[in-house]
Regions:
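Basic, Lys/Arg-rich alpha-helical nucleic-acid-recognition elements, primarily the DNA-binding modules
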Residues: 1-109
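Hydrophobic, Leu/Ile/Phe/Ala-enriched alpha-helical segments that form helix-helix packing faces
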Residues: 49, 76-83, 138-146, 221-232, ...
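Glycine-rich, often proline-containing surface loops adjacent to acidic residues and nearby aromatics
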Residues: 55-56, 109-121, 195-204
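Short, amphipathic alpha-helical interaction segments positioned at domain boundaries
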Residues: 100-130
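Exposed, interaction-prone assembly regions rather than primary DNA-binding/catalytic cores
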Residues: 122-216
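Charge-rich, low-complexity terminal tails
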Residues: 193-228, 288-317
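Catalytic cores of nucleic-acid endonucleases
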Residues: 205-265
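Non-catalytic C-terminal interaction segments of nucleic acid-processing enzymes
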Residues: 247-342
Length: 342
């Protein structure tokens, strides 16, 4: 009787990534929109918005292309006339209102970009819209970063660095009328950029007063802590950017991030038996062959539990957690409260 070799979560995950086609470049995606009849500038902007936010305000478009109110208004009217954009809020007498929010929803655009089911196309709460506008503002200011716009591209990046999906923030969704479950990664849907040496994570959360914002920032950091530890274990640097609407918010969040900045603590010494267990789990995870764990540790589940006890013991002995190498702040002046009401 032949025994079927079991596959670990990482092995299955890697196989899926490798089987997938290489995602198109930004230039290739923009070319797909030009094929629909959009001009170079229109295709460039629509590609940026669809990939990174789904929403924009006129002043963001003006800043990127250094254009005035008139050309911007004509551009927005073209998008609305084509049925691919909705603009929230009434235009004032000048036919221009910088606080209006444009939502790019046209299915044909997202389909051409290969992201037809992207959530940016759907309506969202005001909280989510503001978060997307803030994070998009940073992306616009830093086009030189190697942005990873979609979930598959982010996952593939971490996989290339040898990082297990188990440490990537994730959530399982269950359908209302089916037993089928869907696992989604990086559900905060905030920008990430990486070049293999350093990885940048953008945080934007404008909801509530100072105390609530501080609590939500801490929650976001903890959700990413295992991923950041894995990056640093591989000698990668973690850079966090917090995007805010005021300088006061930026200062408050910088103070919080400072508590997590610093070198990772030295590794705690392991006994020979503990190291053998961790090595055996790493080997099983990379090969998909769990039989050695059956023979020596009573199976994969007991081995995983023992490994968790080892890691928890080591973590408790390391002192205050340090997850990031650097941080910075970005005040989105185009989105400050006196420009765009909360």
């Amino acid at each position: 009787m032949h025994r079927i070799q079991r596959r670990s979560a990482l092995t299955s995950y890697c196989a899926g990534i490798e089987a997938a086609t290489t995602p198109p470049t930004f230039a290739e995606r923009a070319a797909a929109l030009r094929a629909l009849g959009w001009t170079d500038r229109q295709a460039d902007w629509l590609t940026l918005v669809c990939l990174h936010s789904g929403v924009f305000i006129r002043s963001q478009y003006q800043a990127r292309y250094n254009v005035t109110d008139g050309p911007t208004a004509r551009f927005v009217r073209t998008l609305i006339g084509a049925g691919v954009v909705r603009e929230a809020g009434s235009l004032d007498r000048r036919g221009y209102r910088p606080t209006s929010i444009c939502h790019v929803h046209g299915r044909a655009l997202y389909r051409a970009l290969g992201i037809e089911d992207n959530r940016h196309r759907r309506n969202a709460s005001r909280e989510v819209i503001m978060r997307r506008l803030l994070s998009f503002d940073y992306v616009l200011e830093h086009p030189e970063c190697g942005w990873l716009p979609t979930e598959p591209e982010k996952l593939a990046y971490f996989q290339r660095l040898g990082i297990s999906p188990a440490v990537v923030p994730q959530r399982v969704y269950h359908g209302l009328f089916t037993d089928r479950a869907t696992r989604r990664y990086l559900v905060f849907k905030l920008p990430i950029a990486g070049n293999g040496t350093a990885t940048t994570f953008v945080h934007a959360d404008p909801v509530g007063g100072p105390r609530l914002q501080a609590d939500r920032l801490r929650t976001w950091v903890i959700a990413h802590s295992a991923l950041w530890e894995a990056l640093r274990d591989r000698e990668g640097a973690v850079h966090v950017v917090t995007v805010t609407r005021t300088a006061a918010e930026a200062a408050a969040k910088a103070e919080i991030l400072e508590t997590w900045r610093g070198p990772p603590p030295p590794a705690a010494p392991r006994s020979e038996a503990d190291q053998q267990l961790m090595d055996a789990i790493a080997l099983a995870d990379s090969t998909g062959d769990l039989r050695p764990l059956d023979a020596k540790y009573g199976g994969a589940i007991p081995a995983a539990r023992a490994a968790r006890r080892i890691l928890d013991r080591e973590k408790a002995g390391r002192g205050p957690a340090k997850y990031i190498d650097a941080y910075s702040t970005h005040v989105a002046e185009r989105l400050t409260p006196d420009v765009l009401a909360a």
